[in-house]
Swiss-Prot record:
InterPro entries: MJ0106-like (IPR004425), Proteasome_assmbl_chaperone_2 (IPR019151), PSMG2_sf (IPR038389). The keyword Transmembrane helix applies. GO terms for cellular component: plasma membrane. It is found in: Cell membrane. It comes from the Archaea. Gene3D superfamilies: PAC-like subunit (3.40.50.10900). This is Uncharacterized protein MJ0106. Disulfide bonds: none annotated. Keywords: Cell membrane, Membrane, Transmembrane, Transmembrane helix. The chain crosses the membrane at residues 19-39, 79-99, 141-161. Its main location: membrane.
Length: 238
Protein backbone atom coordinates (compact mmCIF):
# COMPACT_ATOMS: atom_id res chain seq x y z
CA UNK A 1 0.00 0.00 0.00
CA UNK A 2 2.87 2.37 0.87
CA UNK A 3 4.41 1.70 -2.56
CA UNK A 4 1.41 3.40 -4.21
CA UNK A 5 1.99 6.61 -2.23
CA UNK A 6 4.34 9.46 -3.02
CA UNK A 7 5.39 12.75 -1.42
CA UNK A 8 6.29 15.51 -3.86
CA UNK A 9 8.54 18.22 -2.37
CA UNK A 10 7.86 21.71 -3.70
CA UNK A 11 10.36 23.69 -1.63
CA UNK A 12 13.84 23.24 -0.21
CA UNK A 13 13.95 23.78 3.54
CA UNK A 14 16.96 23.24 5.83
CA UNK A 15 15.33 21.50 8.78
CA UNK A 16 16.72 21.55 12.32
CA UNK A 17 15.17 18.51 14.05
CA UNK A 18 11.62 19.61 13.22
CA UNK A 19 8.44 18.71 15.05
CA UNK A 20 5.98 17.03 12.67
CA UNK A 21 2.36 17.93 13.47
CA UNK A 22 -0.44 15.92 11.87
CA UNK A 23 -3.58 18.08 11.62
CA UNK A 24 -5.90 16.04 9.42
CA UNK A 25 -9.69 16.49 9.73
CA UNK A 26 -11.48 14.52 12.43
CA UNK A 27 -14.05 15.00 15.18
CA UNK A 28 -15.05 18.67 15.40
CA UNK A 29 -12.28 19.50 12.91
CA UNK A 30 -10.30 20.67 15.94
CA UNK A 31 -6.97 19.42 14.58
CA UNK A 32 -7.53 21.08 11.21
CA UNK A 33 -8.57 24.35 12.85
CA UNK A 34 -5.46 24.38 15.05
CA UNK A 35 -3.20 23.36 12.17
CA UNK A 36 -4.56 26.06 9.87
CA UNK A 37 -3.98 28.70 12.54
CA UNK A 38 -0.36 27.56 13.00
CA UNK A 39 0.26 27.66 9.24
CA UNK A 40 -1.19 31.17 9.03
CA UNK A 41 0.38 32.71 12.15
CA UNK A 42 3.86 31.25 11.59
CA UNK A 43 3.68 32.03 7.86
CA UNK A 44 4.77 28.50 6.97
CA UNK A 45 5.89 27.73 3.43
CA UNK A 46 4.07 25.26 1.17
CA UNK A 47 6.46 22.31 1.39
CA UNK A 48 4.86 19.60 -0.72
CA UNK A 49 1.95 17.22 -1.19
CA UNK A 50 0.98 13.56 -0.92
CA UNK A 51 -0.13 11.49 -3.87
CA UNK A 52 -2.45 8.78 -2.54
CA UNK A 53 -4.38 6.50 -4.88
CA UNK A 54 -8.13 6.47 -4.34
CA UNK A 55 -8.58 9.77 -2.50
CA UNK A 56 -11.17 12.30 -3.65
CA UNK A 57 -10.02 14.23 -6.76
CA UNK A 58 -10.44 17.58 -5.03
CA UNK A 59 -8.27 20.63 -5.68
CA UNK A 60 -8.07 23.56 -3.28
CA UNK A 61 -7.77 27.07 -4.73
CA UNK A 62 -6.01 29.74 -2.65
CA UNK A 63 -5.58 33.22 -4.14
CA UNK A 64 -6.16 31.73 -7.58
CA UNK A 65 -3.52 28.99 -7.23
CA UNK A 66 -4.52 25.27 -7.12
CA UNK A 67 -3.18 22.97 -4.38
CA UNK A 68 -3.57 19.20 -3.87
CA UNK A 69 -5.87 18.20 -1.00
CA UNK A 70 -3.29 16.46 1.23
CA UNK A 71 -0.21 18.60 1.72
CA UNK A 72 2.49 19.89 4.06
CA UNK A 73 3.64 23.33 5.19
CA UNK A 74 6.91 23.96 6.99
CA UNK A 75 9.72 26.11 8.31
CA UNK A 76 12.99 24.85 9.78
CA UNK A 77 11.34 23.90 13.09
CA UNK A 78 7.88 22.61 12.18
CA UNK A 79 6.18 20.50 9.52
CA UNK A 80 2.38 20.70 9.50
CA UNK A 81 0.47 17.96 7.67
CA UNK A 82 -2.87 19.30 6.46
CA UNK A 83 -5.77 17.87 4.47
CA UNK A 84 -8.91 19.32 2.94
CA UNK A 85 -10.52 15.89 2.81
CA UNK A 86 -11.28 13.17 5.33
CA UNK A 87 -8.86 10.31 4.79
CA UNK A 88 -10.58 6.99 4.07
CA UNK A 89 -10.28 4.46 6.95
CA UNK A 90 -8.85 2.02 4.40
CA UNK A 91 -5.96 4.41 3.66
CA UNK A 92 -5.06 5.48 7.20
CA UNK A 93 -2.79 2.60 8.19
CA UNK A 94 -0.74 2.82 5.00
CA UNK A 95 -0.60 6.62 5.07
CA UNK A 96 0.55 6.65 8.71
CA UNK A 97 3.40 4.31 7.79
CA UNK A 98 4.25 6.42 4.74
CA UNK A 99 4.30 9.65 6.77
CA UNK A 100 6.87 8.20 9.17
CA UNK A 101 8.93 6.82 6.29
CA UNK A 102 8.79 10.13 4.38
CA UNK A 103 9.87 12.42 7.22
CA UNK A 104 12.29 10.08 8.99
CA UNK A 105 15.14 11.50 6.88
CA UNK A 106 14.40 15.00 8.23
CA UNK A 107 15.60 13.87 11.70
CA UNK A 108 12.33 14.81 13.43
CA UNK A 109 12.46 15.58 17.13
CA UNK A 110 8.84 14.54 17.68
CA UNK A 111 5.64 13.58 15.87
CA UNK A 112 2.42 15.16 17.19
CA UNK A 113 -1.11 14.11 16.22
CA UNK A 114 -4.01 16.52 16.81
CA UNK A 115 -7.54 15.21 17.20
CA UNK A 116 -10.81 15.45 19.05
CA UNK A 117 -13.01 13.33 21.28
CA UNK A 118 -16.77 13.84 21.44
CA UNK A 119 -17.75 15.05 24.89
CA UNK A 120 -20.67 17.44 24.40
CA UNK A 121 -18.44 20.31 25.58
CA UNK A 122 -15.11 21.92 24.71
CA UNK A 123 -13.05 22.17 27.88
CA UNK A 124 -10.21 19.70 28.42
CA UNK A 125 -7.36 18.43 26.27
CA UNK A 126 -6.13 14.88 26.86
CA UNK A 127 -2.80 13.36 25.96
CA UNK A 128 -1.48 10.01 24.74
CA UNK A 129 2.08 8.97 23.85
CA UNK A 130 4.06 6.01 22.57
CA UNK A 131 6.57 6.01 25.49
CA UNK A 132 6.28 6.12 29.28
CA UNK A 133 8.76 9.02 29.48
CA UNK A 134 6.59 11.07 27.13
CA UNK A 135 3.52 10.33 29.26
CA UNK A 136 5.30 11.78 32.29
CA UNK A 137 6.20 14.92 30.35
CA UNK A 138 2.63 15.28 29.01
CA UNK A 139 1.30 15.34 32.58
CA UNK A 140 2.82 18.83 32.90
CA UNK A 141 0.42 20.10 30.24
CA UNK A 142 -2.68 17.89 29.94
CA UNK A 143 -4.65 15.11 31.56
CA UNK A 144 -3.70 11.63 30.33
CA UNK A 145 -6.32 9.72 28.35
CA UNK A 146 -6.22 6.54 30.44
CA UNK A 147 -8.58 4.20 28.62
CA UNK A 148 -10.68 4.25 25.47
CA UNK A 149 -10.52 4.03 21.70
CA UNK A 150 -8.93 6.57 19.35
CA UNK A 151 -10.07 6.59 15.73
CA UNK A 152 -8.51 8.13 12.66
CA UNK A 153 -4.85 8.86 12.04
CA UNK A 154 -3.77 9.56 15.63
CA UNK A 155 -3.41 6.11 17.16
CA UNK A 156 -2.02 4.60 13.96
CA UNK A 157 0.63 7.30 13.64
CA UNK A 158 1.82 6.79 17.22
CA UNK A 159 2.14 3.03 16.67
CA UNK A 160 4.04 3.43 13.37
CA UNK A 161 6.37 5.95 15.02
CA UNK A 162 7.08 3.53 17.85
CA UNK A 163 7.77 0.73 15.35
CA UNK A 164 10.35 2.95 13.67
CA UNK A 165 11.96 4.37 16.80
CA UNK A 166 10.42 7.86 16.80
CA UNK A 167 8.82 9.70 19.72
CA UNK A 168 5.17 10.61 19.20
CA UNK A 169 2.34 12.14 21.20
CA UNK A 170 -1.34 12.73 20.56
CA UNK A 171 -3.40 15.66 21.82
CA UNK A 172 -7.15 15.09 21.98
CA UNK A 173 -9.44 18.06 22.57
CA UNK A 174 -12.93 17.63 23.92
CA UNK A 175 -15.42 18.74 21.29
CA UNK A 176 -19.16 19.26 21.11
CA UNK A 177 -19.71 16.95 18.18
CA UNK A 178 -19.29 16.68 14.44
CA UNK A 179 -19.74 20.38 13.60
CA UNK A 180 -16.59 22.56 13.39
CA UNK A 181 -15.52 23.51 16.90
CA UNK A 182 -13.17 26.53 17.02
CA UNK A 183 -13.12 26.50 20.83
CA UNK A 184 -11.77 22.94 20.79
CA UNK A 185 -9.17 24.07 18.24
CA UNK A 186 -8.23 27.00 20.48
CA UNK A 187 -7.81 24.63 23.44
CA UNK A 188 -5.36 22.55 21.39
CA UNK A 189 -3.43 25.68 20.43
CA UNK A 190 -3.25 26.80 24.04
CA UNK A 191 -1.50 23.53 24.94
CA UNK A 192 0.77 23.67 21.87
CA UNK A 193 1.74 27.26 22.69
CA UNK A 194 2.86 26.16 26.16
CA UNK A 195 4.67 23.05 24.94
CA UNK A 196 6.54 24.56 21.98
CA UNK A 197 6.44 28.36 22.52
CA UNK A 198 4.49 28.84 19.28
CA UNK A 199 2.88 32.15 20.28
CA UNK A 200 -0.05 31.44 17.94
CA UNK A 201 -2.95 33.85 18.46
CA UNK A 202 -6.10 32.14 19.73
CA UNK A 203 -8.26 35.22 20.38
CA UNK A 204 -9.92 35.11 16.96
CA UNK A 205 -10.82 31.44 17.44
CA UNK A 206 -12.36 32.22 20.84
CA UNK A 207 -14.39 35.06 19.30
CA UNK A 208 -15.51 32.75 16.50
CA UNK A 209 -16.49 30.09 19.06
CA UNK A 210 -18.49 32.61 21.09
CA UNK A 211 -20.28 33.81 17.95
CA UNK A 212 -21.20 30.22 17.01
CA UNK A 213 -22.33 29.45 20.58
CA UNK A 214 -24.47 32.60 20.73
CA UNK A 215 -26.05 31.77 17.38
CA UNK A 216 -26.82 28.21 18.52
CA UNK A 217 -28.31 29.55 21.76
CA UNK A 218 -30.46 31.95 19.75
CA UNK A 219 -31.62 29.14 17.45
CA UNK A 220 -32.41 26.93 20.46
CA UNK A 221 -34.49 29.71 22.04
CA UNK A 222 -36.35 30.25 18.76
CA UNK A 223 -37.01 26.52 18.56
CA UNK A 224 -38.38 26.43 22.13
CA UNK A 225 -40.67 29.40 21.42
CA UNK A 226 -41.90 27.73 18.25
CA UNK A 227 -42.57 24.47 20.10
CA UNK A 228 -44.38 26.33 22.89
CA UNK A 229 -46.53 28.18 20.37
CA UNK A 230 -47.32 24.94 18.54
CA UNK A 231 -48.45 23.28 21.77
CA UNK A 232 -50.91 26.10 22.42
CA UNK A 233 -52.27 26.34 18.89
CA UNK A 234 -52.26 22.65 17.94
CA UNK A 235 -52.19 20.64 21.21
CA UNK A 236 -53.56 17.46 19.61
CA UNK A 237 -50.56 17.23 17.23
CA UNK A 238 -47.82 17.64 19.87
Amino acid sequence: MVDSMKFVEKAKIEFENPIVIEAFPGTGLVGSIAGFQIIKDLNLKYFGYFEVDGILPLTTIEKGIPYPPVRAYANKDFIILFSDIIISPFKINGLAEFIVKTFSNKNPKLFVSLGGIMAGKSEKVFGIANKEELIEDLKNYVEIFDFGVVGGMGGNLLIKCHDNGFDAIGLLAETVGIRPDPRGGANLLEVLNKMFNLNVNIENLIKEAEAIENKLKELAEQHLKMMSKSRKEYPMYI
